[in-house]
Structure formats: structure tokens, C-alpha cells
Amino acid sequence: MLTMREVTKDGFGAKVRDWNKTALIEQWRERWADHVNRALAERDIDARIDHRSLEAQGIALEPQDKIGPAASRIGGRGLEAERIEEHRAIAQRNGERIVANPALALDALTHQQATFTKRDLAAFVHRHSDGKEQFDAAYNAVRSSPDLITLGKDGRGQDRFTSRAMIETEQRLHRAADTMAQHTDHAV
């Protein structure tokens, strides 16, 4: 956390309004994402973060504010109650979208990591649905989707999954690499 006020020999001065500029905040978010993604790659962790909005990422879900444990506990009062209600309404709409089109969940999950577990899927669906009934419907819709590909067990014995679109992307990349390898006259 940073103060928005300039510190001088006389104490705190006026607020630095430059820090409120959207372009600067977006630049900070992009640099943070780059930093985190480098650290994840150095540790061979198959996950990435994206600083862009869901819309900019091509994910057709509504963004939701994070509702922390403290806000959830106090639940029925004032502004927090309004935020919680809006969060639930958005989660309900997102859950309906996932039930209608399970590929939305698969695309969002594989946008962050190439493969995922049942737990990753459950956490995603939980975050984007409202209540047990909708969670079950959305989770089952994704699990029964023909676009969900089971890869097998990982080193921890957990089932790993990906999407048909991710497999197709990897196959296109493999074919492109093979084509490039066959040509000796390309410049690098």
C-alpha cells in the first residue's frame, strides 16, 4: 500500500493525482503480470495470469468483485450487503452462461493454464455460479462437454484435463514447428 500524498520535509503534501491515471494503473498491472508470469515459468508452473479484462481476453463472462471472508460473514448490512447481492446476481448470470455453453469455462481455464484438475474446475465453477444447485448444473455441464479432454493422471495421481480447443492449438503449433524444421532456407 502506498500513500497518494507526497512526503516533504514539512510532512504530507498534496495528493499525487498522476497515480490515478488509468494508463499508469494499466501499465503497473501489465508489468506485475509479466513479473509473476516470469516467476511461474522459472519454476515450471503451468499457470499464467492475465492483467486484461475478461472482455479483452475474449472470455464471455461478467467480471465479479471479490467478496472476502470478512464481508461474507457480516453479510446483511449496508453497502457490503449490496455488493454481496450484486456479486451473487453476476455469479447467477455467469452460471447460466456456463450451463448453456460449457466451452466458456473450458476456454477461461485453459487461458490461464494448459491443463487443469477437477479441483481447478470446481473452484472456477464455484466462483462463477450461485448456490449448490447451479454449481452442480454448471459443473456437470462442463464435465459432460464433448470439448473436455481427459489427459490422464499427473505425478500426484490427480486426473488432468484440457479442452479440445487447446489440443487443436497445440497440434497447429506442432505442425508449424515441423514445417519450419523442414525448411533450411528461412531466416531467423
Residue ranges and their predicted role:
Residues 3-174, 184-187:
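Single-stranded nucleic-acid nicking/binding segments centered on His-rich, glycine/basic loops
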